Amino acid sequence: MSNGAFDAIFEYAWGQIDKPISGDFIYGKDLPKLIEIIENIFQKAQKSGSYELRLPLFSEINKDLFRTFSNTKTFFKIHKEEFDDIFFNLVNHPLREILENAFIGVDSIPSDFIVSMNLNSPSKFLVENKNKNTEGAGISTPRKKLTESPIKLLSRXNIGKALEVQVEELKRELTAKQSLLQENERQVSELKIRLETYQEKYASIQQRFSDLQKARQVEDNQNSSRTSDPGSPLVTGIDQKAILEEFRRRLQRQTDTISFLKDQIRRERGLNCSNDKVSHSKRKHATTDGDGTFKNFISAVPSNIWVKATIRIIVCFALLAGVLPYIRKYVYAHDTPSQNSRLQLSWWENSGILSKIVWFFEDQTDLETEYRSNANVDDAYSRVFGI
């Protein structure tokens, strides 16, 4: 196994990133760039056709890990002595093993790999490192910087100012990241609160839905029980508001109907008196053609004259009632009684004028009785329905 070739590759890639002023370390943000430089070396070797290689060296998952590390630990200092441990923790394999396994048919990196690639690396370092590896196998030598650091050329004040500027930048970045972290934590807490609220609403809606399903089942059971057994008592689980609203609606409709009927009765009392008299007289018996003439005559006569005429008629009726029995006795003495004599009309019913007078007074009495009955009915409805 050629440790010198691996060290040379690593030193070359490290030297492309590590600057003398940085102090022999690179930042976490430079890790993907270091891996890219190493991978470019092997891609160049494969294109030249000198070696058979297994490429790519790193999978996309490993590259994602490198990028994540660079984003989360941007200014994390990676020293050479700590690189192997950090790399192993990321991909669970050492970098040396990955590079050695890239060569097909060879168990290690060939010693002439760096020379054949003509890398811009000091040849003196390669020779010294190679001699040390051949002289003492298994003895690891510390890595040295290939170029002389220009820090010696700068004054201590300039170095201090540069470090102060770098520290201030790091502090500002740290403050910005802390603010961003606090904002993210606040958003996370708000999202948690909203999530709890939505969960409570969902639980409430689910409970209401379950209650509605149970109510629907109870209602279906009630309908089926009423269909099968009409005499069974109703279950008291129905919405009381809907029942009361339906009762109010029906009561209002009934109240309107009663009011309309009462108004109609009041109108009929004043307008249909004469018509009621005629209808009652027609229900009693059939009259002659002179009925209409007599009715018109009564309605045309003034009330005072009508009263006087009524008194005179009554007197005449009394006289006739005393005289007519004697006349009837002599007129109908020789008539034989018929089988239907009990169905014959009275003597005063055979006279059109007398029957008119009698039926007029009877109809007037019936109308007054009917009006009193209607008034009693109206009062009863008013008391029942609170009108």
From Swiss-Prot:
Q: What are the coiled-coil residue ranges?
A: 157-269
Main site of residence? nucleus
- Database matches in Pfam families: MPS2
Taken from the UniProt entry, a GO cellular component term is:
spindle pole body
InterPro entries attached here? Answer: Mps2 (IPR031433)
Cite the residue spans of the region called Disordered: 216-235
- State where the protein is found: Nucleus membrane; Cytoplasm, Cytoskeleton, Microtubule organizing center, Spindle pole body
Q: Where is the composition biased (Polar residues)?
A: 220-230
List GO BP terms, alphabetically: protein localization to spindle pole body; spindle pole body duplication
Acyltransferase as a keyword? Answer: no
Membrane topology qualifier: Single-pass membrane protein
Q: Where are its TM segments located?
A: 311-327
Protein's UniProt keywords contain Translocase? no
Q: Which UniProt keywords apply?
A: Coiled coil, Cytoplasm, Cytoskeleton, Membrane, Nucleus, Transmembrane, Transmembrane helix
Q: Which domain of life is it from?
A: Eukaryota
Family that this chain belongs to: Belongs to the MPS2 family.
What is the role of the protein in this entry?
Answer: Component of the spindle pole body (SPB) required for insertion of the nascent SPB into the nuclear envelope and for the proper execution of spindle pole body (SPB) duplication.
Q: Subunit comment for this entry?
A: Interacts with BBP1, MPS3, and SPC24.
Q: What is this protein called?
A: Monopolar spindle protein 2
